[in-house]
Design a protein with these regions (language model features):
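Substrate-binding clefts and catalytic carboxylate motifs of secreted carbohydrate-active enzymes
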Residues: 184, 191, 218, 225-228, ...
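Active-site mouth of glycoside hydrolases
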Residues: 69-235, 240-242, 246-247
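Short N-terminal secondary-structure initiator segments
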Residues: 17-24, 36, 83-88, 95, ...
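Generic, ordered loop/turn and secondary-structure boundary motif
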Residues: 26-27, 61, 148-150, 155, ...
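Secreted/periplasmic carbohydrate-active enzymes, especially glycoside hydrolases
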Residues: 1-119, 138, 258
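Active-site oxyanion-binding pockets that recognize sulfate/phosphate
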Residues: 26, 154, 209, 213, ...
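Residue-level preference for short coil/turn positions at secondary-structure junctions
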Residues: 32, 177, 232, 273-274
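Generic recognition of flexible, low-complexity loop/linker segments
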Residues: 24-26, 108, 170-172, 265-266
């Protein structure tokens, strides 16, 4: 151990040391999740204090290389290429403080038992509680961390940018020592929503130029610069998805593929133009379990097309706005790949 003398006020001390043959941190399915403890003791003539920082020893590289298909996007852990298997993580409760450490352990544990080794903290949610990252550390679940920006058009005035800088630096400083944290991402769908969903067509040319300059400054300058001041060891991904808009094909990076849900058939995934290098988001609608439904649905409304169920679903087709679109899609897949349910409980 090393000793240092402190002066009154803030002290900034850098301590270099070498770990000889350290045990490494690996993701789920690739090895053990060894965690090391580093202790700092502060002593005065009359009192003392200790601080313990847990950390894992590992390297994570995001590989972006030009190749015969386009440009790769994959993760390399401790020199070994990893096939990422996982899901998107949204807030565990509409009232997050209602949840405990055991709730995070249960949910992340279920992901690990399912063979997952990565969770993407979705940008429309929040910077998660320490219990989530601790659980991921111990289970070997790598974390893709979005900044808290999603599906919207954000301002770029100086006061707002100063607030963003403070928010980003605070959260990066809080989370950077977790070995599970694999990469930072600027936002969820802010670029594709603007360039591909028609939002830019609602603006004048002058407004577009102003907003696009602000978009670039926020996610390509302000946020990565704020991250680098607290953590210059991790890859920064400006926006997810990085493909499917602005003329960038799926062969160049990560994609959000909703063709199975929106397009209607699993075969959509297999079309060459839909095969992405990293599938960072996809999904399918689902019902809550019966335990949850019985809390708010009256017995006489326990059917897919009831007013109560349709009001809670609100999953419409983008074109027809058919309120029963979700049920029709579910039934189509059940008929094709499973069986026709005999009652509502079996349907759920």
């Amino acid at each position: 151990s090393d000793r240092y003398s402190l002066i009154e006020g803030a002290n900034d001390i850098t301590c270099d040391f070498v770990l000889k043959k350290p045990s490494l941190w690996w993701c789920n399915g690739y090895g053990r999740q060894d965690i090391h403890e580093f202790t700092v003791d502060v002593q005065t003539e009359s009192s003392s204090a200790s601080y313990i920082q847990k950390a894992g020893v590992r390297t994570i590289d995001v590989i972006r290389q030009d190749d015969a298909w386009g440009k790769s996007m994959s993760l390399r852990l401790n020199g070994y290429d990893v096939f990422c298997k996982g899901a998107n993580w949204i807030p565990v409760d509409n009232f997050p403080t209602r949840r405990s450490r055991s709730d995070y352990a249960e949910l992340t544990g279920a992901a690990a038992e399912a063979g997952m080794n990565m969770l993407r903290v979705w940008g429309g949610g929040l910077y998660e509680h320490e219990d989530f990252y601790d659980a991921c550390d111990s289970l070997g679940i790598m974390v893709w961390q979005d900044m808290a920006f999603a599906c919207g058009m954000f301002p770029s005035d100086e006061a707002y940018l100063q607030s963003v800088t403070a928010e980003v630096r605070d959260n990066v400083r809080r989370l950077r020592n977790h070995p599970s944290l694999a990469l930072w991402c600027g936002n969820n769908e802010n670029e594709i929503s603007y360039f591909e969903w028609g939002w830019n067509r609602t603006l004048t040319q002058e407004q577009r130029e102003h907003y696009e300059a602000g978009l670039h400054r926020l996610f390509y300058e302000i946020i990565p610069e704020a991250i680098a001041k607290e953590d210059d060891t991790r890859y920064y991904h400006p926006s997810s998805p990085s493909t499917g808009h602005s003329g960038v094909p799926y062969s160049m990076g990560d994609a959000h593929m909703w063709s199975v849900w929106k397009g209607g058939w699993v075969e959509e995934y297999l079309k060459p133009h839909n095969i992405a290098r990293f599938m960072s988001e996809y999904g399918f609608i689902s019902y809550p379990d019966m335990f949850t439904l019985k809390k708010f649905v009256p017995e006489w409304d326990m059917r897919p097309d009831s007013p109560t169920m349709l009001a809670h679903h609100r999953a419409y087709d983008d074109t027809t706005r058919d309120p029963e679109y979700s049920n029709k899609t579910i039934c189509r897949y059940l008929d094709r790949y499973a069986w026709v349910p005999e009652d509502f409980e079996e349907f759920v």
